[in-house]
Amino acid sequence: MLNIQRKEGVALKETISSYDDLFEMLDSFLREPVTFWNDFYEDREKNIPFFQVNGPDENLVEYMETTIKPNRVLELGCGPGRNAIYMAKQGCKVDALDISENAISWAMDRAKEEDVDVNFHCKSLFDFSFEPKSYDFVYDCGLMHHLAPHRRLTYLEIVKAALKPNGYFGLVCFNTDGAINTSDWEVYKSGSLKRGIGYTEERLKKVFNNDFNILSFRKMKKITQPNGQFGEDFLWASLMKKIN
């Protein structure tokens, strides 16, 4: 039997009259993301793999050097700004989003140190306003695998809406070495996303196959630190092209 309990401190309307109401109700059964991610980014010295690296993802460097030359870029879940700063240094105009004030503050500090201009926004992807079909490239390192299943379809629609025709989408997310391959139903049965959802290759490709041509799909290369780039092999790295 599905045993769902509302998380403490969450006030909801008792009548569902829209999809937003439905999503808000389902959100309430899981952890509150803003508080969770603010706490996560509070200690910049924490022993988290990507906290120890200032440079970009190794796969992103590969994409930029071999396949894509974007002008306008949208980064989802930018964290401390490693990838946004790298892309800005390559001449891109970057909008970078994160729901954590602590993450955005850290990212802005790094950008100032590097003397780089990035448009950082402390916003949820679902609350961010943009001109449709205005980005050449959308990049997500680590957001999607922390999304509740009921948010995944909206996430996909937003990515598609943001991209220009023939635009590119880059994704880094947990494989099953990085997190458990939790079923969508199990997330709600347990009332927890735990440390995130680990995707098999088949499951991840199924999410995107109808809307994107998958150009590259592999495990990230594990890079020993210190290094100017980040890479861990418990993550998938994929580059896709929007099907118009």
Language-model features: locations:
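Class I (Rossmann-like) S-adenosyl-L-methionine-dependent methyltransferase catalytic domain
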Residues: 2-74, 80-130, 147-158, 162, ...
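Short catalytic micro-motifs in class I SAM-dependent methyltransferases
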Residues: 142-146
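A short acidic, Gly/Pro-enriched loop at the edge of an enzyme's catalytic core
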Residues: 130-138
